[in-house]
């Protein structure tokens, strides 16, 4: 069994890959692309007898990376024999603060399980490439047994090749004075390009979680540029909003938050989001039976959830990173482990065919359940009242307006941007 590493700058050319041409990506790479790989691979021809580790001569392994220069017989380990097939996970924005928390959760087995080996494929930019090398070094020094491969690069057509999961965190932050329409266009270009790359080289059943904001519309752009991947496989992260809502309900009810279930965030990841207390439960009872303060539920609860990020910035001096990473891990775990009986989770998904009457062809956060196979179904046993529906329609209108802003990126003609008010969440300005 071989344990190897490659660290090789490569040159290539910048051009978008045509849709539907999966293996043409070799000709469509950014100029001066960089790719480095730290890999643990099975090589029966190089197995070491008796499980003894041996180092290869430096002269024959000039490109190796630290501990990955050493070879091991991994078949000598009983737990290795029972491991599942390796899962390839791409992470964009991999040199950022969110990724700095997330990657170690992934590598530890906390997210996919203690019998699931993984390969991490980290996407950055020329500007962040040295930082990516530092991230790879920290992962190396952490000695995670399930982490079998680490590669870093700036070309999505290389980094996304054969990935089973794509966690798209990287996006341009909103600068001072930048209109929301401009942010939609700038980040939309990023996610259009990444959608094309996923369509060209990723696994055709890849699961895609969009974190970079505005995440709902970015997810829509991404899926529209990846027609060979099921639209159902694309998600926009609203799990942090759900986690915040659970915390506030638990605080008000005087219980620990593990007693709170069936919390839904409906709509956009913006201040039009709708934390649903009508269907939520505390210790199995409807929230409205436990918390009888209707005014608090309708006003303070919703506003507190929407503005939690801003409150954190005031205290901490920067936007949330660790809690966002936790929510990404939670979102993945909700798809790879069966949903507890009677419960559900929130995620932004494609609305076409939804049972609620929400406009089709947008990405909208809704309640979902999973059997633990990476797929999901929409929960149907939900209640609606006028208060909830009115707010859902407001968030729907916002997403329809955003969709018009990016029509040039989704193949639907010329863009027309008329977002009536600025609803970006605190920390995104």
UniProtKB/Swiss-Prot annotation:
InterPro entries: Lactate/malate_DH_C, Lactate/malate_DH_N, Lactate_DH/Glyco_Ohase_4_C, Malate_DH_AS, Malate_DH_NADP-dep_pln, Malate_DH_type2, NAD(P)-bd_dom_sf. CDD domains: MDH_chloroplast-like. GO terms for cellular component: chloroplast. The record marks 64, 69 as: Activation of NADP-MDH. The keyword Magnesium does not apply. Pfam families: Ldh_1_C, Ldh_1_N. Substrate binds at residues 174, 180, 213, 244. Keywords: Chloroplast, Disulfide bond, NADP, Oxidoreductase, Plastid, Transit peptide. Residues 1-40 form a transit peptide. GO terms for molecular function: L-malate dehydrogenase (NADP+) activity. It catalyses: (S)-malate + NADP(+) = oxaloacetate + NADPH + H(+). NADP(+) binds at residues 93-99, 187, 194, 211-213. GO terms for biological process: malate metabolic process. It is found in: Plastid, Chloroplast. Disulfide bonds join 64-69, 405-417. Its main location: plastid. Chloroplast NADP-MDH is activated upon illumination. In order to be enzymatically active, disulfide bridges on the protein must be reduced by thioredoxin which receives electrons from ferredoxin and the electron transport system of photosynthesis. It is an enzyme of class 1 (oxidoreductase). Homodimer. This is Malate dehydrogenase [NADP] 1, chloroplastic. It comes from Sorghum bicolor. The lineage of its organism: Eukaryota, Viridiplantae, Streptophyta, Embryophyta, Tracheophyta.
